Amino acid sequence: RGSXLTILPLRNIID
């Protein structure tokens, strides 16, 4: 979440 990874599918596990 705002980690920057929000553009990656990983956002589903870090949301």
From Swiss-Prot:
Post-translational changes noted in the entry: N-glycosylated.
Name recorded for this polypeptide: Pregnancy-associated glycoprotein 70
Alphabetic keyword roster: Aspartyl protease, Glycoprotein, Hydrolase, Protease, Secreted
Entry annotated with the keyword Manganese: no
Top-level lineage group: Eukaryota
Biological source species: Bubalus bubalis
GO BP annotations, alphabetical order: proteolysis
NADP listed as a keyword: no
Enzyme class: hydrolase
Tissues expressed in: Expressed in chorionic epithelium (trophectoderm).
GO cellular component: extracellular region
Subcellular location field: Secreted
Enzyme Commission designation: 3.4.23.-
